[in-house]
């Protein structure tokens, strides 16, 4: 759900001509899973998603003319999207 919300924000962002596609969202899901595995977990936490988002999203975004004129970068847009999209809050599991 968090990844889908991030992708949706990119699709409606005023400085983007083209946001993240469903395939881009799936790529973020896969890389977040890989990061979780590398960290020794069999589950993804929001930090996995936020840490991988720039690597997965930045080259997939198409900036608008206004964004390019004002020297925005895809990385800056990804950071903005992450800042304005509330990550899910994890609750502790109870036995």
Predicted features along the sequence, with ranges:
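Helix-loop-beta hinge of the Bergerat
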Residues: 6
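C-terminal engagement/docking regions of AAA+ P-loop ATPases
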Residues: 1, 10-95
């Amino acid at each position: 759900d968090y990844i889908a919300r991030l992708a949706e924000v990119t699709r409606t962002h005023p400085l983007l001509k083209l946001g993240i596609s469903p395939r881009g969202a799936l790529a973020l899901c896969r890389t977040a899973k890989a990061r979780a595995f590398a960290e020794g977990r069999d589950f993804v936490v929001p930090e996995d998603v936020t840490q991988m988002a720039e690597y997965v999203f930045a080259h997939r975004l198409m900036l608008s003319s206004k964004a390019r004129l004002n020297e925005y970068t895809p990385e800056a847009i990804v950071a903005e999207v992450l800042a304005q999209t509330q990550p899910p809050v994890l609750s502790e599991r109870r036995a």
